Every structure is written in structure tokens, then in C-alpha cells.
Curated annotation (Swiss-Prot):
UniProt-listed Gene3D superfamilies: N-(1-d-carboxylethyl)-l-norvaline Dehydrogenase, domain 2, NAD(P)-binding Rossmann-like Domain
Binding residue positions for NAD(+): 2-30, 65-66, 96, 246
Induction trigger: By valine.
UniProt name for this protein: 3-hydroxyisobutyrate dehydrogenase
Gene name per UniProt: mmsB
Family: Belongs to the HIBADH-related family.
Any one Gene Ontology molecular-function term assigned to this protein's record: NAD binding
One GO BP annotation of this record: valine catabolic process
Disulfide bonds listed in the record: none
Active site annotation, chain numbering: K171
Protein EC: 1.1.1.31
Annotated catalysed reactions: 3-hydroxy-2-methylpropanoate + NAD(+) = 2-methyl-3-oxopropanoate + NADH + H(+)
Amino acid sequence: MTDIAFLGLGNMGGPMAANLLKAGHRVNVFDLQPKAVLGLVEQGAQGADSALQCCEGAEVVISMLPAGQHVESLYLGDDGLLARVAGKPLLIDCSTIAPETARKVAEAAAAKGLTLLDAPVSGGVGGARAGTLSFIVGGPAEGFARARPVLENMGRNIFHAGDHGAGQVAKICNNMLLGILMAGTAEALALGVKNGLDPAVLSEVMKQSSGGNWALNLYNPWPGVMPQAPASNGYAGGFQVRLMNKDLGLALANAQAVQASTPLGALARNLFSLHAQADAEHEGLDFSSIQKLYRGKD
């Protein structure tokens, strides 16, 4: 049993904290939304009135926040956790942020004698609820070894990608490829249907041929082809368009910083941005709704 502080109880953080409780850990929780805290308290967590109070007595601190500026605000500055937290807890940030930001915060932690790992996740809300997330960890090997037993209570695949920031780099590479694959799959399906093909038949042909990919196997973007996919449920739930746009933006910013050529990543970002701008509701839909961009008005 480990004393854990969990900061950020949104769509991902809430279920992750719940799985730590199910595993028998003592979990203190904090979120800016009192309702989110109450939901975890009802499951056995101890609620806190501030991030600092949440971390009192913690052996491990886990944060899951929307963006880099929130991570910097939590950890850095005179009022940040690095300046005020007691003891030597292991710090694990599961937010998806720029690699440069992850390194900046980790270096500040090291200056205080603390270890902060970047550990972004893959698997979406469904994976968070089921405890089957993939964690992609950046940081020293000894920190990874300490974190692994805790992360295994929330995930199925735990990867050590390398030093500080490596987890974030691997995550944005994966999601850039995911965006490219989904856009390409939607484009191919739309072309086939315009020529009179049955999307289910075309999907099966491509699945069993050299065009086979994750989207065709598990997450078909055409409505009605795969009953359990978001596409067959009004594109509700899953990985939202706004989050795909955020991650593609992080990938392109990093590519510019390291002078890497990512023309397909840039095109995917443009396509998802165009999709988001087409209708105010699109940002909240699952990213496979990019199919709508290709279908037009049918």
C-alpha cells in the first residue's frame, strides 16, 4: 500500500485515481472542480482543499492536467509544489505536454533533489476506466523502477522511453501517426463509397490487404461498419477532435524545434483543424469523425 496524491480528476484522471483505490492504495485527491473530488471521496479517497494539502505525507504524487501551462503553474514558482512540498515524493506527470516543458519541470525538480517523470498515457477514457492504459515514461531508470508498480495499477503496458521528455516525444510521435492513419483511412473509405462500394466490404478488403491498420481493425470511422466504434454511436466519447488537434500541434512545434520534416503531420493537422472549424460541435466529437470532412453532404 502506497500513500498517493492525485492532482487532476478529469475524464482521464478520475478513473485513474479510482483504479489506485481499487488496488488498495491510500489516495488523496484534489481538483479545481469540487464535484470531481466528491466523486472520488465517495469511492474511498481523502479529499483535499489544495494541491499542497493533497501532497501531505505522499510517497508518490501523480498529476494529470490539460496542458503545459497548468503543469508549470502546479510545480514551478514560489507557490509551486517544488518549492513547498515536504519530503521526497516521487513525482509523476501524466499530462500530454511539450517535451521542452517536461524537461524544464524535471530539471527544476532535480535542482530540489526530487525526481519528476513524464508519463503521458495512451488508451483514452475507456482505457483509463478499464485500467488498460499504456504509460510512456521519460526519466531516470531508478525513477522508472519506483513508478512501475504504481503505474501497473492503472495500465497494461508500461514503457521506459528514455530520459526526461522522452515519454512526451514518443507520445506525440504515436498520436501524429494516429492522426495520419485515421485521415488516410477516412479518405480511402470515402473514395470507395463515392464509387458505389459497400464501406463494410471495402473495410474488410483493406483489413486483409496491405492497407490494413489499427483504425480498420478496431476503430472504423464509417458509421455502421463496426458497432462498438464511436462512428456507429454518433462519434460520441473516445478521443476528441480538440485533443487530436492539441497533440498534432505539439508534434509540429517539436518538429520545428528539432528541424524534423513532418509534411504528413502538418497535413493531418490542417485537416483536423478544418474539420473542427466546419461546425462548433465537431471539437467535442471523437477524432474518427474526420470522416465527416470527406463525406460532405453525401
